[in-house]
UniProtKB/Swiss-Prot annotation:
Its main location: cytoplasm. Residues 5-52, 81-124 form the SpoVT-AbrB domain. This is Transcriptional regulator MraZ. It is found in: Cytoplasm, Nucleoid. Keywords: Cytoplasm, DNA-binding, Repeat, Repressor, Transcription, Transcription regulation. CDD domains: MraZ_C (cd16321), MraZ_N (cd16320). Negatively regulates its own expression and that of the subsequent genes in the proximal part of the division and cell wall (dcw) gene cluster. Acts by binding directly to DNA. May also regulate the expression of genes outside the dcw cluster. GO terms for biological process: negative regulation of DNA-templated transcription initiation. It comes from Klebsiella pneumoniae subsp. pneumoniae (strain ATCC 700721 / MGH 78578). Disulfide bonds: none annotated. Belongs to the MraZ family. The gene is mraZ. Forms oligomers. The lineage of its organism: Bacteria, Pseudomonadati, Pseudomonadota, Gammaproteobacteria, Enterobacterales.
Amino acid sequence: MFRGATLVNLDSKGRLAVPTRYREGLIENAAGQLVCTIDIHHPCLLLYPLPEWEVIEQKLSRLSSMNPVERRVQRLLLGHASECQMDNAGRLLIAPVLRQHAGLTKEVMLVGQFNKFELWDETTWYQRVKEDIDAEQSATGELSERLQDLSL
């Protein structure tokens, strides 16, 4: 399980160093193989250990290529999916087209989200967090049943 937000740097070749606390698990559970794709709702990237991505691919394969919405989701997620192999130094190369989608330059937020990571431009990440907090503070609507059961 991945959790927490960590600032990492992209080097001049577009590589990021995976934080040490995640490396061993990624090697043991995914042989250091990950898949990176775009988030179709936010200006960030999604980074999955290969076994987790294979579950997503199975779900995508069951969507209908005849349904325009389902086909669009397949095209966006699979068409941007790029395999990333963690090197001996624990670095991952993020493809240029993916970096461009998320506006990644030098400083990147690696955000744990249970079975995957999100990769955000640092400035965009903090703007998003502020927007989300503001939205929660001003929310007047009903909570979903699942959120009502969540006690923090």
